[in-house]
Amino acid sequence: MKTKIIVIVGPTAVGKTALAIEVAKCFNGEVVSGDSQQVYRGLDIGTAKASPEEQAAVPHHLIDVREITESYSAFDFVSEAKMTIEDIHSRGKLAIIAGGTGLYIQSLLEGYHLGGETPHEEILAYRASLEPYSDEELAHLVEQAGLEIPQFNRRRAMRALEIAHFGQDLENQEILYEPLIICLDDERSQLYERINHRVDLMFEAGLLDEAKWLFDHSPNVQAAKGIGYKELFPYFRGEQTFEEARESLKQATRRFAKRQLTWFRNRMQVTFYQIGESGVQDRILSQIEEFLDD
């Protein structure tokens, strides 16, 4: 019997953390971060980690588990998330995965992990190369590769082609979970306004100092490549004004949100909720209750 879990995804600044905490309180749950940047100690503001008060109210996992000089991959996430979910479930509690790193969450849910020597950037690039193909063209590629896909759909076709292309670097494993995947969204202009406002709040909270600390200590590590930090490095090098760097960060974050939505819409079977609609949280909680009782 597969373990039921709740998965909360969506673009940055849409309110995933707040919803995850509310779900955890209502259903005796614990939150597992599905964010590739929140694993790093010392990077708190730019990664929008749950506050110390929020983490005290509800247990959070896979936050602050790496130093900024250490790497972190989808393989690491899947391995650690599986152990964490098993521990949460063994204590009779509900695991709630919340985050915006689509590759990590999809890898966990679809029963394979990324191992071997292939960087996940190469896998992302390969996936992106398949996007322009129509369903008919994908079916032809699947046939050419000698693959058989029961109940053909686009997602299964792309996954099968990835496995065939990368060989042992994509290892099939048993699918362990029965997820309810909730994707939060907002009207585009409202979402962009939320993003701009959150960036302003981050600067008020000390983002510039946090980014400067990273720039001074480890500007070339993986942790420094995340949105929220690298956009400020030109300012530290004297190549941009502060206002130019701040606007660059806002623009990069808006573009990132758009890519996140595209990923969740095209690659995962989600239930969308518009956060601006009246009573949306009550409807989400009702759906979760029905899912858990089923």
UniProtKB/Swiss-Prot annotation:
Q: What is its EC number?
A: 2.5.1.75
- For the keyword Lyase, the answer is no
What EC class does the entry list?
transferase
GO BP terms in the entry: tRNA modification
Q: What is this protein called?
A: tRNA dimethylallyltransferase
| A Pfam family annotated for this UniProt entry | IPPT
Q: By its UniProt entry, which Gene3D superfamilies does this protein fall under?
A: P-loop containing nucleotide triphosphate hydrolases
